A protein has these predicted regions:
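Active-site histidine-anchored catalytic micro-motif
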Residues: 1-137
Length: 137
């Protein structure tokens, strides 16, 4: 079995931001030499996530509004009693998930016609990374 590991780095301009990373993942898969297998894409920070969905501006906006209703910024969360101020980011990351596993077929990502991979930042404006681990034959 072949295993190839790479990293994507992010430093978003906004506190909350969704970044489409499908092309970057596809490029890593291509250079890995894996023809049949899977790729794990995992955010390596507790206030960031990775998810798969449609790349449509209205839907991205809907996600942001929905998450803000579920875990509003600025509330007096217990986590803030420890000196932190980002409990909402932890909650949003938990809702959206921190990793995805994607199929590789014939050396390419095997996604549905509308599926795209996103990095979700919920406490941004600092350097963070995503691990991309390609495994297979």
């Amino acid at each position: 079995m072949l295993v190839h590991t790479d990293y994507l780095w992010f430093n978003t301009k906004k506190r909350q931001e969704f970044v489409r990373i499908t092309d970057e993942i596809a490029a890593i898969v291509k250079t890995s030499g894996v023809a049949e297998g899977m790729v794990l894409v995992s955010a390596m920070h507790i206030t960031a996530g990775v998810f798969v969905n449609d790349w449509e501006d209205g839907l991205i906006h809907d996600f942001q509004e929905w998450l803000e209703k579920l875990a509003p910024a600025g509330l007096d969360y217990r986590h803030h009693q420890t000196g932190e101020d980002n409990a909402d980011a932890h909650l949003k990351r938990t809702i959206m998930g921190h990793q995805v596993t994607l199929p590789i077929t014939a050396g390419k990502l095997d996604l549905g016609p509308w599926e795209q991979v996103f990095y979700a930042e919920f406490d941004g404006q600092r350097r963070k990374r995503v691990v991309v681990k390609v495994m297979g034959e």
